[in-house]
């Protein structure tokens, strides 16, 4: 068993990374930054300038904004200024009303908002907002590296907060605290399977929120309605009425609603609601239909979510690699555990996932993310089925090595560094295509 001090630090890490969110986290992070700048200014700004990293732009261009029936950054920025509350974090717009949405639309139409690509930065998650009023006062708020992490706040040139970013953990010598919380797949598995149950029951909230989001989504017509399609006669006729089809339907329906801008909270993972859904719903549905115990489900959810957090530590919050690869790898581990697998089989499931999905490109948050989530989740089930029979991709195949942690590093090296040019080309295509 992992000692109490290390368990405490891992639990703190999980509670930072597994948090509720309403709407896609990138536009919500921009709304949060606008809300903070507005609160610092002390009045509704007459003009707002937003300087954003390429990955923030990419993930905010085509996704629905909760409660608005609108898509994209301008309305998210306007509502952040008019009604956003920074104390709500990624639920910054949870109190928005129809009347306030109308005010937000007017704010956008008055062309008070300017959005720019921030040049000369290395951070893939960067949001800088400058809010000004008619009297010439200004306030600046900057978020970087994490969706809710403010690194600088200014008012009229006076610095109120300044927390320069440290180098990424992989670029500097680890501190004692880093070493205490340094993860490997073995440590993730041991934590999930041996930690006293009462210490990890907080993860049940992920089940409650994401299961509710999945159910609510089936009541409406959101996005491409993939989840609904899979649950109807056509879907059942082709996919069958099985654990597999139920997993796909439950997971994709929650993603349908979220990407369409439904005001339904979900439990996110590492700054992504879709990743939180993908870490949760496949595990929950499998456990229910496989008749696993409540304890087994709780431990499987911890294993799924913590595996995703571990992979994201070296990948980064945003990258050219689709996040469903990471989250679905977590759910593959959770499902393998629920099938009765031990550490060896869980490691096999990770190798199977990397052998299949490495290189899936992220082309921004949008309704079609439900399709990618379903691809990831279906691969998770297949990977677990192979792993539980001790079948796995081997050292002779592509990115796979005998050491599973090195396999994970191979995946994240590609996503964090190797696909940077791909990322630039994707954004170029997205910003120059003709939309009619």
Protein language model regions, located:
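Acidic-glycine-rich active-site phosphate/pyrophosphate-binding loop
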Residues: 1-11, 43-56, 242-261, 293-311, ...
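A structural signal for small-residue-enriched, beta-sheet-centric alpha/beta enzyme cores
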Residues: 2, 21-25, 55-56, 143-147, ...
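N-terminal signal-anchor module of multipass membrane proteins
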Residues: 6-41, 45
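Conserved phosphate/anionic-ligand binding catalytic regions in large, soluble enzymes, centered on
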Residues: 20-36, 264-281, 323-326
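Early transmembrane hairpin of solute transport permeases
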Residues: 31-131
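Hydrophobic alpha-helical bundle architecture
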Residues: 37-38, 286-299, 309-375, 388-395
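Flexible, glycine/charged-enriched surface loops at secondary-structure junctions
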Residues: 44-48, 88-93, 114-117, 197-204, ...
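Signature of multi-pass transmembrane helix bundles
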Residues: 109-261, 428-436
